[in-house]
Amino acid sequence: MPKHLLIVESPAKAKTINKYLGKDFTVLASYGHVRDLVPKEGAVDPENGFAMRYDLIDKNEKHVEAITKAAKTADSIYLATDPDREGEAISWHISEILKERGLLKDKPMQRIVFTEITPRAIKEAIQKPRMIASDLVDAQQARRALDYLVGFNLSPVLWRKVQRGLSAGRVQSPALRMIVEREEEIEAFITREYWSIHAECAHPAQHFSAKLIKLDGQKFEQFTITDSDTAAAAQRRIQQVAQGRLHITDVTNKERKRRPAPPFITSTLQQEASRKLGFTTRKTMQIAQKLYEGIALGEEGSVGLITYMRTDSVNLSLDALSEIRDIIARDYGTNALPDKPNVYTTKSKNAQEAHEAVRPTSALRTPTQVAPYLSNEEHRLYELVWKRAVASQMIPAILNTTSVDLAAGNEHVFRATGTTVVVQGFLAVYEEGKDNKNAEDDDEGRKLPVMKTGENVPLERILTEQHFTQPPPRYTEAALVKALEEYGIGRPSTYASIIQTLLFRKYVDMEGRSFRPTDIGRAVSKFLASHFTRYVDYDFTAHLEDELDAISRGEEEWIPLMKKFWVPFKELVEDKKDSLDKTDAGSVRLLGIDPTSGKEVSGRIGRFGPMVQIGTVDDEEKPRFASLRPNQSIYSISLEEAIELFKMPRVLGEDQSQQVSVGIGRFGPFAKRGSTYVSLKSEDDPYTIDLARATFLINEKEEIARNRIIKNFENSQIQVLNGRFGPYISDGKLNGKIPKDREPASLTLEEAQQLLIDTGKPARKNFSTKKTATKNETRKQTTKKRTTDAKATKKVSDKPVKKQIKKRIAPNITE
């Protein structure tokens, strides 16, 4: 029987480690967090030292039971969850559960950490156990408590003032503000015209282009020429003076070094995977998790291919450095090796939480060697990690930049530049991606012919080119992660979840690979920026993150931080609940006056989303409403465009003695005849669609509906229907199976009723009714961690919890 129990977070990791440790160990997975705050008000109690009440997570109950069962027979227990705050908290929760159940009285329980899943790393960790780091646990608990208090208290204010079902998060909201402010910059941007002038030179050795840098003796700047007439006049003056040639006045050669980027940390891995591979942050972390936990490599079995992927550290272990340097010498020559390893400095004060950068566990496993065992996406990400780590330990690239000035007379000067690689260095392996290219990037790789001062170069022609200034680009995932990192908002473990939350809550949409805020997102951001300014302030959020870091290092206590945050936050929430109306909330935009009725026209967030409205609730007549068309926004729609929307519904005519009309509803454009509604196709415009097309769509839908019904029964709700997976029986509430050996159309009512009794399942999924009263709750106290007594546990009854879930937790408490 195994003597030791080792607990990790994922089953894949458990499988890999179990292979390394052998029969003396049982390796089990917790499947992530095992407990969370109880889903009801008071889960964090500011009046009682911010005591926190926990509940087992439903889906992980069986895994906790498996761990408990194994712990009873084990001689010792090792907690081997991830080497960061979340991992430390999971270990603490597991230890508390086992302690509550009386399983730690006579056996040692220790914490071990490792940043790679290799036999050496696992065995070394077991030889160097430690106690659970209470500072890391405190930092995680403080973060969780802050997120709960913000979400639980701020989200209901959004429900009342903006729209039901919305949520606000401590870190999510500043990230949303970034995206919204960028969109406002884009909308406010005024395009300016400007012109550039180029000389096409016909050098005998090679044709090349040169850009005008001086016109009429003055420096040529971006807006020196802003119209075509001025550009054409300048072109004529230069051509007249040049007389078919340009005179070389200066040739400059300059060498510069480009140093390799450090090995990946979480944020740079996410940014590069977005730029080079087109991966979302979520996909990057999911694939990296698989590579970290273990991939089956044929006879070698399951092997962890990369180190832990949630890290702020750019350090590499001595063993890793030695192996990487051996690879460089073998594959790229000793000339590609620096005299000593390249050392990089991390920006994060907390990089000690996870001790290494993201790197291959063994550089000897080249991307080519492991390719047969990896999916295409896994291979591409592994290759990225491998190349970045290897390149980080190579010599700099040496680039030579040549700059040539060519004059037309004494008043006009052009400049040609080119950059060539003299020594490849790390560029032989890897080149870092960029979000936006600049002029230097355009010159790179461009060679110029050998030229000397005093020579003349034949001029082929002078070209003018029109340009327009461009607004700042929307944030891509890579750019947003970079901005969050630069502001100090969020941490490696949270970037992907921040983005996922914004998308899930429909506060932003993806337009191509860029974020565009939705009207709901803009309304939420505007409301928070106007009335909870401090709590979406970038510096405030970053400072709070720094204080959480300080707690994790043991430099600050978590209770004083909670008090400092909670007292003013609570006062502000209470004030705003009663003092604001929807106009103050920023979800209403006045557009002007309707010329027909003389009433006010506004854009606003309604119950079902963005809409426009004619009139107000104070008018004698009820206000009229109209939904927006796709790609319209209440923040940019004009008065004329809004009034156009009220032409809906349009009556197209009659068909089958019934009126046919089109309109725009909460789910988009539709056509209607009698009681039959059908959504318009993407190519159909509700403002131009004709009667023939609308009736075709309606008839098509009715034909499909007729074919769906195989059999009706007189005086009964039961029908025999065609479904996605074949024929079935339904009474609208239950769906039942039809035996494969029965002809659906031949079923009698009695047979159908019996089949519903025997095989019927709810037509719609119901919420889980699993009881929670028997679960353990614990509190995290200011002075010590202890379990609640039996009476406290019994207070968490079934019905109040479910009621609270429905009424209060719907906002989703997020960062």
Curated annotation (Swiss-Prot):
Task: Give me the reactions it catalyses.
Answer: ATP-independent breakage of single-stranded DNA, followed by passage and rejoining
For this protein, the record's PROSITE patterns field holds:
TOPO_IA_1, TOPO_IA_2, TOPRIM
Single GO MF annotation:
DNA binding
Quaternary arrangement and interactors, per the entry?
A: Monomer.
Q: Where is Mg(2+) bound in this sequence?
A: 9, 82
Annotated region described as Disordered, given as residue ranges? 760-815
What name appears for this protein in its UniProt entry? Answer: DNA topoisomerase 1
Q: Which InterPro entries match?
A: Topo_IA (IPR000380), Topo_IA_2 (IPR003601), Topo_IA_AS (IPR023406), Topo_IA_cen (IPR013497), Topo_IA_cen_sub1 (IPR013824), Topo_IA_cen_sub2 (IPR013825), Topo_IA_cen_sub3 (IPR013826), Topo_IA_core_domain (IPR023405)
- Family, similarity comment: Belongs to the type IA topoisomerase family.
Q: Which one GO biological process term can you cite for this protein?
A: DNA topological change
Question: Where, by residue number, is the active site?
Answer: 308
The chain positions of domain Topo IA-type catalytic read 133-573
Gene name as annotated: topA
Keywords from the named record: DNA-binding, Isomerase, Magnesium, Metal-binding, Topoisomerase
Residues annotated as region Interaction with DNA? 167-172
Name the residue ranges with Basic and acidic residues bias. 774-801
Q: What does this protein do?
A: Releases the supercoiling and torsional tension of DNA, which is introduced during the DNA replication and transcription, by transiently cleaving and rejoining one strand of the DNA duplex. Introduces a single-strand break via transesterification at a target site in duplex DNA. The scissile phosphodiester is attacked by the catalytic tyrosine of the enzyme, resulting in the formation of a DNA-(5'-phosphotyrosyl)-enzyme intermediate and the expulsion of a 3'-OH DNA strand. The free DNA strand then undergoes passage around the unbroken strand, thus removing DNA supercoils.
Q: Which SMART domains match?
A: TOP1Ac, TOP1Bc, TOPRIM
Q: What is its EC number?
A: 5.6.2.1
What are the residue boundaries of the Toprim domain, all occurrences included? 3-119
The site feature described as Interaction with DNA is recorded at 33, 143-144, 147, 159, 310, 505
Protein species of origin: Xylella fastidiosa (strain 9a5c)
- Specify the superkingdom: Bacteria
Cofactor requirements of the protein:
Mg(2+)
| Disulfide cysteine pairs (residue numbers) | none
